[in-house]
């Protein structure tokens, strides 16, 4: 239970001020094991999403460009933050921090009482530096809204009957994570009565959009890595094969969705008719495989060929490639 003063503290506004400095942040990223650098809007979004149901919490971004790096530059920083808070109408009477060394500095430069929160890191025994150095090792400490940013994506490509769907399912199981199924199959069933005979040019943007939504869902709930059954280059290749031209919306998604690892399965496994496949001859399979390679290269997409002709060897090779990407030791 809270006494009167504590109850007042519980309902008063809280202000989270996120500092950023392009030069400093770039250096931190380059010294990290992160695959991409978060932008200022990325970081703001994480905070806004995390605290969106706590209406008394306000999120701000404070530009620290040109200020001496921590722990120096207190005079310049404190003058800057005073001006910033005045502009935002922030009148704090408490500062919360986990850094013991900062408490006297806040009092000296800002004249504000400081409340230490878990200064010994007994509850949250992690630092930002540790996460930057090895995000996957400290995965459980990364906030839910932030995890998708660190997720690695693996796209499995190949022609018809190359074993993509089964392989993606097995990989997701072995890595205990999510996968994005090929949306085109669901679309054919839900919109075309289960038969591609009615497929036309105007369907490809809808197929691509649905697949993008599947991918986004898989990434959002992934455990470090998400597996994608078929990419947008494959969708574009089918469009070019059947309609004689490429689709600009599909191309836009090719440009937007870049995967960390693209695996191209060789078309050297037995072809199995399932009612939705029509490129079963050796000539058709070879032509489509060549088209995939051509379009991958045109779009400057690096890929790894998996040429093993039996499913078990193919699976083990893919596991090896994913582990290498994740930085795991054999």
Q: What residues fall within each predicted segment?
A:
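Short, surface-exposed acidic-centric catalytic microdomains
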Residues: 15-72
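Single conserved hydrophobic/aromatic residue that forms the stacking wall/gate
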Residues: 1-7, 11
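Glycine-rich phosphate-binding loop used to anchor ATP phosphates in small-molecule kinases
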Residues: 206-257, 272
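Conserved substrate/cofactor phosphate-moiety recognition/catalytic segment
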Residues: 169, 173-216
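Conserved lysine of the Walker
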Residues: 164
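The conserved Walker
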Residues: 160
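A glycine- and Lys/Arg-enriched "phosphate-lid" helix/loop adjacent to the NTP-binding pocket
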Residues: 243-312
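Classical nucleotidyltransferase
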Residues: 44-46, 58-153, 157
């Amino acid at each position: 239970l809270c006494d009167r003063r504590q109850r007042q503290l519980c309902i008063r506004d809280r202000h989270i001020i996120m500092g950023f400095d392009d030069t400093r942040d770039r250096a931190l990223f380059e010294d990290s094991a992160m695959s991409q650098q978060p932008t200022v809007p990325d970081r703001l979004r994480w905070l806004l999403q995390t605290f969106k149901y706590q209406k008394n919490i306000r999120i701000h971004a404070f530009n620290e460009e040109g200020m001496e790096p921590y722990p120096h530059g207190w005079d310049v920083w404190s003058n800057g933050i005073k001006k910033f808070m005045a502009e935002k109408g922030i009148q704090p009477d408490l500062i919360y921090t986990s850094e013991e060394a900062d408490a006297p500095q806040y009092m000296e430069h800002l004249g504000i009482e400081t409340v230490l929160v878990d200064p010994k890191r007994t509850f949250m025994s992690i630092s930002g530096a540790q996460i930057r150095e090895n995000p996957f090792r400290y995965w459980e400490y990364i906030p839910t809204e932030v995890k998708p940013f660190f997720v690695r994506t693996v796209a499995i490509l190949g022609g018809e009957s190359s074993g993509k769907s089964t392989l993606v399912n097995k990989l997701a199981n072995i890595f205990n994570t999510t996968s994005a199924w090929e949306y085109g199959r669901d679309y054919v069933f839900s919109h075309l009565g289960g038969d591609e005979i009615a497929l036309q040019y105007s369907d490809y943007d809808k197929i691509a959009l649905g697949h993008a939504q599947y991918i986004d869902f898989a990434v959002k709930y992934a455990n470090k890595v998400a597996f994608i059954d078929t990419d947008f280059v494959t969708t574009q290749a089918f469009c070019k094969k059947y309609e004689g031209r490429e689709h600009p919306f599909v191309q836009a998604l090719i440009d937007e969705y870049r995967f960390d690892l693209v695996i191209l399965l060789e078309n050297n496994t037995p072809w199995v008719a399932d009612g939705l496949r029509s490129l079963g001859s050796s000539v058709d399979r070879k032509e489509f495989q060549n088209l995939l390679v051509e379009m991958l290269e045109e779009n400057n997409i690096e890929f790894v060929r998996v040429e093993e002709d039996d499913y078990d060897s193919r699976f083990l090779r893919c596991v090896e490639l994913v582990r290498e990407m994740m930085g795991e030791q054999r």
